[in-house]
Amino acid sequence: MPTAAIDPPGITWLRVSPKYVTVRLVEWALGNLVMVAVLSLPLVFVRIGWWRWPPLWLAIGLPAFMLLLALWRLVLIPRQVRAIGYAERGDDLLIRGGIFFQRVMVVPYGRMQYVDISAGPVERGLGLCTLKLHTASAGTNAGIPGLPAEEGARLREQLSARGEARLAGL
């Protein structure tokens, strides 16, 4: 998808690790497995005669529909991961994401209060982390998921240093 309309000119985006697709797929599989299992319970209960409602077509249709939605997400996940990027500029950090609804967020270094790194079990197993930026604004939800752990640590130190330098200049 073209992004020229929202991308600032002259920016070279750094992309997150392709291994982040695996993290998203594991999360997808666990969540959807539980969802389809729960939505299939009425089908099981109707088939063994415990319930008379819902009708068989509805008991089959609801989990089938959710399974189709889950498979659609399966197709989208690799594209969503490829759309995530970031760029460091002199005074701010740019973060982009989205396929259909694209977004570019600009976080000035002087507004950063602290930079946090987190990693769940799947991320840790793949050597990845998520970098979160906390600013003075409660509404800021800036983060870069799927970074290699070394890049996340480097970025955390660099952004913290830049934030302190800009904050001291205020």
What is the role of each PLM region?
Residues 1-110, 114-170:
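N-terminal basic, Ser/Thr-rich segments that initiate or prime the first beta/alpha elements at protein or domain
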